[in-house]
């Protein structure tokens, strides 16, 4: 189940890998009144490597407000988090992609009712080494790079040097989103669902590793979330088609819809959240929580 925009806006008006806790005893999804702060309870948030830093910030702040609450956050990938929700080994799955229909069917078969909550937005950025003279690419050019049809930077106006295309691994929601919306060019006249990542693409298990490789390798290209971009790499402007303007990723361009590779960041719970988890998500969607989104380098929910 997905929260519609009207409901999400109402939530926004409510007042109001890192493990934050090494070992916790799970005591269920519902919180109980505590001696300090009025809430107590423990739960896990497992999933997206992209969402992990934001969840860590929120969890740290929430546990300061409610000392009897314990939240453990880990980011092995969206697919792992969704599988954990289906298996009942996490209370919250964090994801940088929507659940697949097959995953929803698996969940329902196990008595799990996936409930989707958008908690922020992300501009999926394309980065290269600062020494790379290329400043912009079209979606079609990116697709050609990641399907091994373009293998030399000179083919897109760069140096005569081999392209080193880096991707997240298959457990990553970022991997899936980029495949659908860039590699397969979803929504464009040239869309092709048969396209796959090429055999020359280098798959890495974390966003940090991909960004680090681009900072060191003058021929590398990668696609981290906006929150992972540093001054050690160079952002490329992206054109939806050759006739469209080249747009750099930013909070502003993601919010106004001009950046072509923006995506929702999501939490999934088993049914509508209650108790301490509901209170935590209320905080995430509050004005204070959304300010943390901006501070962490992500895009807040639009009003």
Predicted regions and their residues:
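Extended alpha-helical regions
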Residues: 1-5, 301-302
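Bacterial N-terminal signal peptides that target proteins for export
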Residues: 3-16
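C-terminal motif of bacterial Sec signal peptides marking the signal peptidase cleavage site
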Residues: 24-28
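Exported/periplasmic ABC-transporter solute-binding proteins
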Residues: 29-303
């Amino acid at each position: 189940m997905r929260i519609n925009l009207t409901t999400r806006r109402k939530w926004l008006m409510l007042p109001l890998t890192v493990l934050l806790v090494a070992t916790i005893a799970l005591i269920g999804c519902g919180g109980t009144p505590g001696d300090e702060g009025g809430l107590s309870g423990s739960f896990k948030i497992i999933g997206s490597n992209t969402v992990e830093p934001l969840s860590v910030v929120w969890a740290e702040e929430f546990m300061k407000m409610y000392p009897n609450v314990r939240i453990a956050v880990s980011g092995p990938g969206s697919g792992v988090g969704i599988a954990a929700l289906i298996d009942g080994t996490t209370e919250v799955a964090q994801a940088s992609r929507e659940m697949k229909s097959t995953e929803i069917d698996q969940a329902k078969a196990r008595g799990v009712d996936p409930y989707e909550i958008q908690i922020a937005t992300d501009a999926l950025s394309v980065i290269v080494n600062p020494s790379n003279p290329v400043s912009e690419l079209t979606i079609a050019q990116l697709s050609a790079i990641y399907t091994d049809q373009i293998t030399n930077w000179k083919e897109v106006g760069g140096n005569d040097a081999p392209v080193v295309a880096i991707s997240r691994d298959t457990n990553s929601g970022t991997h899936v989103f980029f495949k659908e919306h860039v590699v397969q060019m979803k929504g464009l006249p040239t869309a092709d669902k048969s396209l796959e990542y090429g055999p020359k693409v280098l798959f890495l298990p974390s966003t940090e590793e991909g960004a680090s490789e681009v900072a060191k390798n003058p021929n590398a290209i990668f696609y981290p979330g906006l929150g992972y971009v540093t001054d050690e790499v160079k952002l490329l402007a992206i054109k939806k088609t050759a006739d469209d303007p080249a747009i750099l990723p930013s909070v502003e361009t993601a919010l106004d819809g001009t950046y072509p590779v923006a995506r929702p960041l999501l939490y999934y719970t088993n049914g509508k959240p209650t108790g301490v988890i509901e209170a935590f998500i209320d905080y995430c969607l509050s004005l204070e929580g959304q300010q943390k989104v901006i501070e962490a380098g992500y895009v807040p929910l639009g009003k």
